[in-house]
């Protein structure tokens, strides 16, 4: 963690397993695209997030990334303010940004090194290689882990596109609940669908 920041927020409650807040949760369909997704590491059980999730399928599983800290202003009355601590900058996200820069320089070996460093801390027993990335994101990846891209710049088909899809997948996992996905959505023209619970 390079920079932590605090905020008065009920965000942890809004993304929890509460029926009234399920609109803002992370339902199982989205979990299968992020924290429970297959990838170059193999199946979802290889990701180190697998055993940190809890909750029900109906209201969404909870990944306790932003935990609430409650500060009592009056203990007798039981009132106070909810706080969260967020990580504004992490070395993990920085590695993925640098890997993306290497991809656009066509320095795939250095991109693989950064992706390997990320996988070392996020996935069990993963060995990353150019061929593994090209094989998975070139043919095995599904619409859950590989989105249609419509950028206003050129991405070469083949190896460069496969590496970009890999980075976007890893960044989506790394930055869940941080709002940084919107930068990727805008840059790459990824279509977003907002599903309403029960409709």
Which role does the model predict for each range below?
Residues 27-32, 47:
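Residue-level signal for threonine
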Residues 34-37:
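Aromatic (Trp/Tyr) and acidic
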Residues 1-20, 40-199:
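Acidic/polar-rich alpha-helix caps and helix-coil junctions
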């Amino acid at each position: 963690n390079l920079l932590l920041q605090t905020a008065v927020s009920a965000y942890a409650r809004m993304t929890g397993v509460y029926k009234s807040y399920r609109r803002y949760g992370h339902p199982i369909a989205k979990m299968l695209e992020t924290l429970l997704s297959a990838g170059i590491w193999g199946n979802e059980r290889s990701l180190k997030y697998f055993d940190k999730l809890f909750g029900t399928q109906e209201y969404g599983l909870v990944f306790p990334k932003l935990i609430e800290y409650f500060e009592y202003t009056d203990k007798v009355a039981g009132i106070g303010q909810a706080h969260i601590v967020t990580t504004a900058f992490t070395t993990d996200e920085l590695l993925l940004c640098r890997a993306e820069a290497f991809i656009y320089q066509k320095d795939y070996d250095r991109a693989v090194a950064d992706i390997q460093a990320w996988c070392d801390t996020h996935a069990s027993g993963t060995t990353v290689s150019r061929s593994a990335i090209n094989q998975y994101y070139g043919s095995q990846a599904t619409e859950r882990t590989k989105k249609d891209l419509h950028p206003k710049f050129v991405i070469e088909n083949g190896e460069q596109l496969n590496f970009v899809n890999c980075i976007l997948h890893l960044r989506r996992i790394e930055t869940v609940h941080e709002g940084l996905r919107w930068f990727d959505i805008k840059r790459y023209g990824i279509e977003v669908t907002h599903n309403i619970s029960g409709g």
